[in-house]
Amino acid sequence: MKIDLNADLGEGCASDSALLQLVSSANIACGFHAGDAVLMQQCVREALKNGVAIGAHPSFPDRENFGRTAMQLPPETVYAQVLYQIGALAAIVHAQGGELRHVKPHGMLYNQAAKEPPLADAIARAVRDADADLVLVGLAGSELIRAGQHYQLTTRQEVFADRGYQADGSLVPRSQPGALIESEEQALAQTLEMVQHNRVRSLSGEWAHVKAETVCLHGDGAHALDFARRLRAAFAGRNIDVSADLE
């Protein structure tokens, strides 16, 4: 059994270099919510050194609120912004002899695209037009995954180790109680349940179906590295290989 393990990088976290030794995929901020050209270059260099698959992490233009503010932008505006961010990172990756592998939207762009078909469509079109061989990463079972499949992109369905889930398989909004799982034991158990059995216990107590192809690790928590090491050990003990290549 294989699972991809991804982390968002280039967002100003001191643990980026250490985290790159534990994950198989890196989503690099493209300047709209965090990062800049120099930091993008540094992250790409580190990812290539560690053999980690590189992906673009585009966002709404919202540096002030770290890309977590809801926005109602015309789909064509979102299309252009996502295409722009993918292109910027792709150029940096190619200049260093690497290959851009995937795209995963950030923050509120990710959350809104999970539920809003026009937004999901704009993102999927941008990915296709940038490079039809790119993998589109989105919340498991979401509109973004469906849009990617519509455009015949390879999609990767994502689950979260440290986020609470609702009965429909969506994430509990960060503004609500239960959005973040603080207990490492609970996060570990939830992740193994999702990866091995494709289900997650929702806040209401019901099981929600989720297809786990990649697990997101947040690198900004106080114990992020310890948790990543524990998760890798748990996977190894269950013969689950961590790899960006799931085929």
Curated annotation (Swiss-Prot):
The enzyme's E.C. designation: 3.5.2.9
Which Gene3D superfamilies would you find in this protein's record? Glycoside hydrolase/deacetylase (3.20.20.370)
What keywords would UniProt list here? Answer: ATP-binding, Hydrolase, Nucleotide-binding
Q: Which SUPFAM superfamilies match?
A: Glycoside hydrolase/deacetylase
Q: Which reaction does it catalyse?
A: 5-oxo-L-proline + ATP + 2 H2O = L-glutamate + ADP + phosphate + H(+)
Q: One MF term in GO for this entry?
A: ATP binding
**Which GO BP terms sit in this record?**
carbohydrate metabolic process
Which EC class does it fall in? hydrolase
Q: Name one matching Pfam family.
A: LamB_YcsF
Residue runs in coiled coils: none
Q: What family does the entry list? A: Belongs to the LamB/PxpA family.
Q: How does it assemble?
A: Forms a complex composed of PxpA, PxpB and PxpC.
This chain's function reads:
Catalyzes the cleavage of 5-oxoproline to form L-glutamate coupled to the hydrolysis of ATP to ADP and inorganic phosphate.
NCBIfam families attached here?
PRK05406.1-1, PRK05406.1-3, PRK05406.1-4, PRK05406.1-5
Q: What is this protein called?
A: 5-oxoprolinase subunit A
From which source organism is this entry?
A: Klebsiella pneumoniae subsp. pneumoniae (strain ATCC 700721 / MGH 78578)
The gene from which this protein is expressed is pxpA
